[in-house]
Amino acid sequence: MSRRQVRRVGDSGSFPFVGALHSKSRSSPLLSVCLVLVGACLLIGYAYSGPGMFKSIREVSKITGDYSCTAEVQRAIPILKSAYGDSMRKVLHVGPETCSVVSSLLNEEETEAWGVEPYDVEDADSNCKSLLHKGLVRVADIKFPLPYRSKSFSLVIVSDALDYLSPRYLNKTVPELARVASDGVVLLAGNPGQQKAKGGELSKFGRPAKMRSSSWWIRFFSQTNLEENEAASKKFEQAASKSSYKPACQVFHLKPLH
């Protein structure tokens, strides 16, 4: 009965365009092409609907202009290994998206890695949830003392997180990072002029990112009695030059607290 109703609509002339389209669809490849395109879109949507969807979105946002020193850490791992050698054996990373950094470090030979995520991880994928369950990654407010003993790690790497702290909290947090390190601290900070956090990120970080100049950081280190590690800095620059690596973020090397 339904077929008859469809024919009557076409024959009655109420929808002549539908009838014309129906008569031409057999000979025209347009419909087939449209179906293929729709199918491709569905497949792409399915592929991105898995646990890695949030990571893919974050990667796209970085490509479109959002700065990310955490992504820079992963690029710099070979350079850091050349500069620090055995000091890369026990590494603590502090900063947003720490799960991705910890995973990359764990893939390196003779390297143990832990992470501190300063912000919520509601969109954590299965890999990050596994690291949290194992205790390799913790969620902690870095404005307060870190839950580790002094010199627990050979090297501490911090990225992105400090750009969202006011000087009041930096005075406490940076020395605290140096306290839990035995060999050194690597600090990656955004360059002045880089894009600041978007509206959605403001609700997560609490304040826009503050891009400070290298002279500001050097003055800050001096005021907080933190000493730059010139030997490590030189080795890092030499390794970067050999590999044609140009960091997109400012990189500072600090000595641990004695």
UniProtKB/Swiss-Prot annotation:
The record's EC number reads 2.1.1.-
The keyword Manganese appears for this protein = no
The UniProt entry lists membrane topology as: Single-pass membrane protein
Q: What happens when the gene is disrupted?
A: Reduced homogalacturonan pectins (HG) methylesterification in cell walls. Plants lacking both CGR2 and CGR3 (cgr2-1 cgr3-1) exhibit severe defects in plant growth and development (e.g. shorter hypocotyl and primary root length due to reduced cell elongation, and abnormal pollen tube elongation), as well as reduced levels of pectin methylesterification associated with decreased microsomal pectin methyltransferase activity. The double mutant cgr2-1 cgr3-1 also lacks uronic acids and methyl ester.
- Keywords assigned: Cell wall biogenesis/degradation, Glycoprotein, Golgi apparatus, Membrane, Methyltransferase, Transferase, Transmembrane, Transmembrane helix
As for subcellular location, the record says: Golgi apparatus membrane
Q: Which residues are glycosylated?
A: N171
Q: Which family does it belong to?
A: Belongs to the class I-like SAM-binding methyltransferase superfamily.
Q: What is this protein called?
A: Probable pectin methylesterase CGR3
Q: Which organism is it from?
A: Arabidopsis thaliana
Q: What is the lineage of its organism?
A: Eukaryota, Viridiplantae, Streptophyta, Embryophyta, Tracheophyta
Q: What gene codes for this chain? A: CGR3
